[in-house]
């Protein structure tokens, strides 16, 4: 069991060897402390100066609906359904 202070979080201690799959128990007060430390998307950080939590790159996560939309389908080229088989390159020294 490892106890870590929320205000002094170290990613190398939290995720040993770069593996983020450790079992972590977070309390409600630790989430409040993280909100004060890093802020949320609606309010800026109280404890860090000039730090804003970055916004998501993708606001709509329904990727299949986006990819099947008419705007995207018009921009894509038609699929190439013709299968081109590779010719067998014969070795003249072995195949006499």
Swiss-Prot record:
Keywords, comma-separated and alphabetical: Cytoplasm, Ribonucleoprotein, Ribosomal protein
GO molecular function: structural constituent of ribosome
Ranges of Basic residues composition bias in the record: 79-96
InterPro entries per record: Ribos_uL4_C_dom, Ribosomal_uL4_dom_sf, Ribosomal_uL4_euk/arch
One Gene Ontology term, aspect cellular component: cytoplasm
Compartments in which it is found: Cytoplasm
Principal location listed in the UniProt entry: cytoplasm
Keyword Cytoplasm: yes
Region (Disordered): 77-96
GO biological process: translation
Pfam name, any one: Ribos_L4_asso_C
Transmembrane region(s): none
PANTHER family xref list: 60S RIBOSOMAL PROTEIN L4
Functional description taken from the UniProt entry: Component of the large ribosomal subunit. The ribosome is a large ribonucleoprotein complex responsible for the synthesis of proteins in the cell.
Entry's family note: Belongs to the universal ribosomal protein uL4 family.
Self-association state and partner proteins as the record states: Component of the large ribosomal subunit.
Protein name: Large ribosomal subunit protein uL4
Source species of the chain: Xenopus tropicalis
